[in-house]
């Protein structure tokens, strides 16, 4: 089963994968940032937002994974321990870093701004070097007026806009109208 944990937030795992691996801060820095900015909301009993819930879950997963690594480290050789730690940091650790970065950024800058950044960066990175601007988009400097047009989706989510007239029907498909005859047309 292929589960995309970012789908409900209007983003996708694919968009986050456009960002280079070294883009995401160290896990300790992300955990410290989460604690410094949102400790009350994360430890409180009230449900604040889906982003807070996702951060809580990521922190719990990382804590359990750290316990497992500690237990395994005590019962293995140095070489095996290094291999395990490297593997965890490059797989699960990366996913936790991506998750924490995404949700912390959504809380800090707004979900819409983060989506704009991911799309802008994805376009920038896929554009061949000779045709793209020298500097990549930066999350904190995105203009607020940037508009993302979604493909498909529900019409209720879109802002109201003027309807474009539909193309004209061919005469054979349009209903026939009878003209009332005026007295002048009888001549």
UniProtKB/Swiss-Prot annotation:
Coiled-coil stretches: none
What name is this protein filed under? Capsid protein
Chain segments carrying region 3 X 8 AA repeats of S-P-R-R-R-[PR]-S-Q: 159-181
Cite the InterPro entries for this sequence: Hepatitis_core (IPR002006), Viral_capsid_core_dom_sf_HBV (IPR036459)
Sorted keywords for this record are:
Capsid protein, Cytoplasmic inwards viral transport, DNA-binding, Host cytoplasm, Host-virus interaction, Microtubular inwards viral transport, Phosphoprotein, Repeat, RNA-binding, T=4 icosahedral capsid protein, Viral penetration into host nucleus, Virion, Virus entry into host cell
Segments of skewed composition (Basic residues): 148-180
Q: Does the keyword DNA-binding apply?
A: yes
Instruction: Name its cellular compartments.
Output: Virion; Host cytoplasm
Q: Which GO terms describe its cellular component?
A: host cell; host cell cytoplasm; T=4 icosahedral viral capsid
- Pfam families per UniProt: Hepatitis_core
In the record, the note on similarity to other proteins reads: Belongs to the orthohepadnavirus core antigen family.
Q: Per the UniProt entry, what is one GO biological process?
A: microtubule-dependent intracellular transport of viral material towards nucleus
Q: Which residues carry this modification: Phosphoserine?
A: 159, 166, 174
Q: What are the boundaries of the region Disordered? A: 136-187
sequence repeat locations: 159-165, 166-173, 174-181
**A single Gene Ontology molecular function, please?**
DNA binding
What is its biological role? Self assembles to form an icosahedral capsid. Most capsids appear to be large particles with an icosahedral symmetry of T=4 and consist of 240 copies of capsid protein, though a fraction forms smaller T=3 particles consisting of 180 capsid proteins. Entering capsids are transported along microtubules to the nucleus. Phosphorylation of the capsid is thought to induce exposure of nuclear localization signal in the C-terminal portion of the capsid protein that allows binding to the nuclear pore complex via the importin (karyopherin-) alpha and beta.
Task: Report residue spans for region: RNA binding.
Answer: 181-187
**Where is the motif named Bipartite nuclear localization signal mapped on this chain?**
162-179
PTM characteristics: Phosphorylated by host SRPK1, SRPK2, and maybe protein kinase C or GAPDH. Phosphorylation is critical for pregenomic RNA packaging. Protein kinase C phosphorylation is stimulated by HBx protein and may play a role in transport of the viral genome to the nucleus at the late step during the viral replication cycle.
**Gene3D superfamilies named in the record:** Viral capsid, core domain supefamily, Hepatitis B virus (1.10.4090.10)
Q: How does it assemble?
A: Homodimerizes, then multimerizes. Interacts with cytosol exposed regions of viral L glycoprotein present in the reticulum-to-Golgi compartment. Interacts with human FLNB. Phosphorylated form interacts with host importin alpha; this interaction depends on the exposure of the NLS, which itself depends upon genome maturation and/or phosphorylation of the capsid protein. Interacts with host NUP153.
């Amino acid at each position: 089963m292929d589960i995309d944990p970012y789908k409900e937030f209007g983003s996708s795992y694919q968009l986050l994968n456009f960002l280079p691996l070294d883009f995401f801060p160290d896990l300790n820095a992300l955990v410290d940032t989460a604690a410094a900015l949102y400790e009350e909301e994360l430890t409180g009993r009230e449900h604040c937002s889906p982003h807070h819930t996702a951060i809580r879950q990521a922190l719990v997963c990382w804590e359990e994974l750290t316990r497992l690594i500690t237990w395994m480290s005590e019962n293995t050789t140095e070489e095996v321990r290094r291999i395990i730690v490297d593997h965890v940091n490059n797989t699960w650790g990366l996913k936790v870093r991506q998750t924490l970065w995404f949700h912390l950024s959504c809380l800090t800058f707004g979900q819409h701004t983060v989506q704009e950044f991911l799309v802008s960066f994805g376009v920038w990175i896929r554009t061949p070097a000779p045709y793209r601007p020298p500097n990549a988009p930066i999350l904190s400097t995105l203009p607020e007026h940037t508009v993302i047009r979604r493909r498909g989706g529900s019409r209720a989510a879109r802002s109201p806009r003027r309807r474009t007239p539909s193309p004209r029907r061919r005469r054979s498909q349009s209903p026939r109208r009878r003209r009332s005859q005026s007295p002048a047309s009888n001549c």
